[in-house]
Amino acid sequence: MKLIAFNEILKGEKLTLKATKPDVKFATIYFNLVEKNRFHLKKWLSWEKEIKTVEDALKYFFEKEEKTKNKEVIEYGIYLKGEFIGNISIFNISLEHQSGEIGYWITSDMAGNGIVTEAVKIIEKEVFSNWQFNRIQLTCDPENIASIKVAEKCGFSLEGLKRKDFFSPYFNQFRDTLIFSKLKE
């Protein structure tokens, strides 16, 4: 399978997803949102500690741009009524196996409103229809009830549990990971 191009803007019922670009203005907005939501994010996402400055955010987006060129990851900003409120990406992309993994985060004040569920559905439509993916997956901590609900609402199946597979600085211990997947069929 050959992924030639991807849509830079994806629209849903309430949301617009826009491919992220490395520019100072967006990096500033991104950093400020991460900073404002750091406590909310750090429980489940270890990358938040890497974004300490606007320059870190800009570097992050330059790295993602390179990975996008190599078809390894595609990252979208999540927008509600024109306001940036989070991020969703497809990573661990395998064109050979027509698969990838979805990751996301959203601001604490927008959590619990079905926004991530809609964003995941927009992404799954894109990867199954336009990219001809066969399989997508998402992973989360067994205590991340919000992500478990997203997986269930989007029709993902629980495949299994990886035991103590990553170290969480927040919990200061090794944690399990739930694996959910969805097939095109």
Residue ranges, per PLM feature:
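Short loop/turn motifs at secondary-structure junctions and domain boundaries
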Residues: 66-70
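Conserved GNAT-fold acetyl-CoA-binding loop/helix
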Residues: 42-62
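Residue-level detector of secondary-structure transition/capping positions
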Residues: 35-38, 49, 65
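Acyl-donor (CoA/ACP) binding surface of acyl/acetyltransferases
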Residues: 1-29, 33-40, 75-185
